[in-house]
């Protein structure tokens, strides 16, 4: 797109990932990217391609996804939010829109990405939140989980926590925040890093769960990190408990931040 009147927009997007085969466009299966591009293309009256901050897997949700696109269409700002939402299903929503400079890139301009994993830790399962939380009936020791989690802070080789099919050239990532806490019957894992390997968050959570049910001894996470071997780690935690909650950008872009709903315990 080389026209002089090209504009670049950033959008904040929420979605319930239960109904889609992940963010990325698929040949046959439904994807969030495809649905958003269709709706934007209708409003723009030309084909729109979007770029996201983080490509979430099938079943993963978001309240903080950020995307950008370029367009030659001259539309009101509300057309890119209210108008687009009118063409989206109820489980996807644009929550803010901002015109940005042409050098903004949803993926490459991002400084950090924050995820939240939510576990319903109760003896009986929830019918209401069946596709929104991971149910663990055995009592989790949150203090142990949080203690072990701190060994993952900083820049490390996270080979032990990457998917076997991960295509990233480097296993090194920098985790700047990793906290585990309890809120009544919910156990929450908050994690922030510069970027993540494929399944990295869910593999970390799966291993922390084994710590929480006292299946592993103290310092197991530390040893696991040093082994650099995925086969020694815990099972990948289900996607349904994972939320992309926030993407941090340089302040000069002045992007809005989506407000947490009550389920996110703010």
UniProtKB/Swiss-Prot annotation:
Annotated catalysed reactions: uridine(38/39/40) in tRNA = pseudouridine(38/39/40) in tRNA
GO aspect biological process, one term: tRNA pseudouridine synthesis
Binding site residues for substrate: 115
Quaternary structure note: Homodimer.
Recorded family membership: Belongs to the tRNA pseudouridine synthase TruA family.
Listed name of the protein: tRNA pseudouridine synthase A
Active site: 57 (nucleophile)
A Pfam family of this chain: PseudoU_synth_1
EC nos: 5.4.99.12
Molecular function GO terms recorded: RNA binding; tRNA pseudouridine(38-40) synthase activity
Role summary: Formation of pseudouridine at positions 38, 39 and 40 in the anticodon stem and loop of transfer RNAs.
Keywords of this entry: Isomerase, tRNA processing
Name of the encoding gene: truA
Coiled-coil intervals, chain numbering: none
């Amino acid at each position: 797109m080389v026209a002089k009147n090209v504009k670049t927009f950033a959008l904040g997007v929420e979605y319930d990932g239960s109904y889609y085969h992940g963010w990325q466009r698929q040949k046959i299966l439904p994807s969030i990217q495809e649905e958003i591009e269709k709706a934007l293309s209708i409003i723009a009256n030309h084909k729109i391609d979007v770029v996201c901050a983080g490509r979430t897997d099938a079943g993963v949700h978001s309240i903080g996804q950020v995307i950008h696109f370029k367009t030659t269409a001259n539309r009101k700002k509300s057309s890119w939010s209210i108008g687009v939402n009118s063409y989206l299903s109820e489980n996807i929503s644009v929550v803010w829109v901002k015109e940005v400079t042409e050098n903004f890139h949803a993926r490459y301009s991002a400084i950090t990405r924050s995820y939240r994993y939510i576990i319903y830790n109760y003896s009986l399962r929830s019918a209401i939140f069946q596709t929104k939380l991971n149910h663990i009936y055995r009592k989790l020791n949150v203090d142990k989980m949080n203690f072990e989690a701190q060994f993952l802070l900083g820049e490390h080789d996270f080979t032990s926590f990457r998917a076997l099919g991960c295509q990233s050239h480097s296993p090194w990532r920098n985790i700047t925040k990793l906290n585990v806490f309890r809120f009544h019957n919910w156990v929450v894992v908050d994690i922030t890093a510069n970027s993540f390997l494929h399944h990295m968050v869910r593999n970390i959570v799966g291993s922390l769960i084994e710590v929480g049910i006292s299946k592993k001894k103290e310092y197991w996470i530390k040893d696991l990190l040093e082994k650099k071997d995925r086969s020694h780690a815990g099972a990948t935690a289900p996607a349904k408990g994972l939320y992309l909650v926030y993407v941090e950008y340089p302040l000069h872009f002045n992007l809005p931040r989506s407000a947490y709903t009550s389920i996110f315990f703010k």
